[in-house]
Amino acid sequence: MGWWEITADTLAAGRFALSPLAETTAALKTLHRGTAAHPGERAWLDAHLPAYRALLAADPPTALLVRCALRPTWNATFLTPAPTGDADQDFPAELARIRDTPPATARADLAEALAGAPLPAALRHRADLPERAAALLDWVWRRTVLPDWPRRRRVLEADVLARTARLGSGGWVAALDGMRPGLRWLGANRLQITAHDHPARQLTGAHLLFFPVTPQQSWLSWDTDGRTPPRSAVVYPCSGALAEPDRPPVPGALTALLGGGRAAVLMLLGAPKSTTQLVALTGQGLGSVGRHLQVLRDAGLIARRRAGRSVLYRRTDAGEAVVRAVTAGPEPSGPPSPTPTCGRSTRSR
């Protein structure tokens, strides 16, 4: 078991944030793995895996670099730096940190990831490993993440809001629940980070950050370049309901009944969500979502309750009945049943 010792001040200052680089690295790890965690990820792999494999087939040094850097229990540190969590850190700025890695550091990190196995001779003296890694991540970003970034960002923001709401209502135990395998709050200033055996780390004075990603990937990272204060980060997968891009479409009958925006909100409220989460997931404005919620609540289709500092909305039994009715489809058509009669039948004149 590996754990971090975290002081009360470090934990109190911990926060959730977004990182385009973390999202792109998670996409790279998914392409490298080549298997899908859910149907939406399968469709994404079908669209991008052939081009990714063709790219590496034409570039053997980079293909070997990826195989050495992304190991089952350890990533090469230079490839997964702790994100800053700063709102103004865009993808090019984050990528520059990888590109600027000294070549000797990159080779040492690869050797560490190999856990005692020798670094392949083809990589042992290369000075372009950071540039190759950065170029590959840039390709993954431009080809597979950037075209879908607005939707991904809304999903990530919704996850951050959900975790923050849990933090407000149940503390860090609730906020960390189910975040990644092996991670849980042990108490006594200890955060278990993995079920694997790793030396304990002292995080006194460090910045503790949590970054969601939409692929089903997770890892840990921390600063090793001597910066002050150092950052330690947990990258974790969004909850499945938020991360899967293939949510069932809003039924046309529900759209005809309620209008498109209102129907989309009702469909999302099978599980409790806040107004801000709904804004993030639907892309609608705050005012529009607020009006839809008021109408649905007045109609008895949704109810609200307070959870800590957040107000959460969820479908009522009446709302569930409406959704079931429009998603079940029409009853099978057939000839009308004969009308039952009592006594003698009559014939019209």
PLM feature segments, named:
Residues M1-Q192, P199-R201, S232:
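N-terminal, charged low-complexity regulatory/assembly segments
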Residues A17, Q192-T194, Q216, L258:
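Generic, ordered loop/turn and secondary-structure boundary motif
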Residues A175, H198-L203, S221-G226:
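A general structural signal for short secondary-structure junctions and capping/turn motifs
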Residues W185, Q202-T204, V213-P215:
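A short catalytic or substrate-binding loop motif that flags glycine-/basic-rich loops and adjacent residues
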Residues H196-D197, C238:
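Secondary-structure transition/turn motif
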Residues F211, Q216-R349:
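Extended mid-to-C-terminal alpha-helical interaction segments
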